[in-house]
A protein has these predicted regions:
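A short coil-to-beta-strand element that immediately follows conserved catalytic motifs
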Residues: 92-100, 139
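Short strand-connecting beta-turns/loops that link adjacent beta-strands
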Residues: 19, 106, 179-180
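Acidic interhelical loop/turn segments
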Residues: 94, 104-105, 150
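Conserved short histidine dyad/triad with adjacent acidic residue
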Residues: 101-120
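Short catalytic/ligand-binding loop motif for oxyanion handling, primarily in non-cytosolic enzymes
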Residues: 23, 106-110, 173-174
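Catalytic core of Fe(II)/2-oxoglutarate
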Residues: 117-118, 123, 132-192
Length: 192
């Protein structure tokens, strides 16, 4: 499997980034962490003013941190290979990775936003890996990129699909979903 991604206007979409068995194992990890009560309602704002605003952001998340489950270790190894490749090919200076599961119940979405809030310039590449099996377009939940005031691009959340995009200034949203939607989201960062 090739580790690279091909950028088109600062966005890269890579289907089958992981094998279906690996995606299923990560889906099982997410469900296990939910059963353990490790997910919390997502909040918006800066570290000093975090607040829950479900009409803007309706997901719950769980940060991926130690102790890691075996499938999560495999994912981190694959993402490390990608990070090294991006640094070598694109000279991005990426050193760190932060990741979390994002669970959207039916009806939830995330309004238009950027992933690099003020004071967090270290986030350079955003990534989303979808875990949704048997996804159909009627289910909604697409990742929408705003390319211009009157133009956008939607990407379906299909299992095994990895979406990477250059973080600074990139406005995007998660459209409301009509069924449960699970992904792993995160950022490659420069040094803090």
């Amino acid at each position: 499997m090739s580790i690279g991604v091909d950028w088109v206007d600062g966005i890269a979409v890579r289907d089958r980034f992981l094998a279906p068995t690996q995606v299923r194992a990560l889906l099982d990890c997410a469900h296990l962490r939910r059963e353990r009560g490790e997910f919390a309602a997502a909040r918006i704002g800066s570290e000093r003013s975090l607040q829950r605003r479900p009409q803007i952001r309706g997901d719950s998340n769980c940060w991926i941190s130690a102790p890691l489950l075996p499938a999560e270790l495999t994912l981190l190894e694959e993402l490390e290979r990608l990070r090294l490749h991006l640094n070598e090919r694109d000279l991005l200076g990426l050193f760190e990775l932060e990741l979390h599961y994002a669970w959207y119940p039916a009806g939830a979405g995330y309004a238009r936003h950027v992933d690099q809030p003020q004071g967090r310039a270290q986030r350079q590449v955003s990534l989303v890996l979808y875990l949704n099996e048997d996804w159909a377009p009627v289910a909604g939940g697409e990742l929408r990129f705003f390319d211009a005031p009157d133009r956008h691009r939607d990407i379906e959340p299909i299992a095994g699909r990895l979406v990477c995009f250059l973080t600074p200034g990139r406005e995007h949203a998660v459209l409301p979903t009509r069924r449960e939607r699970l992904s792993i989201s995160g950022w490659f960062r420069t040094r803090s």
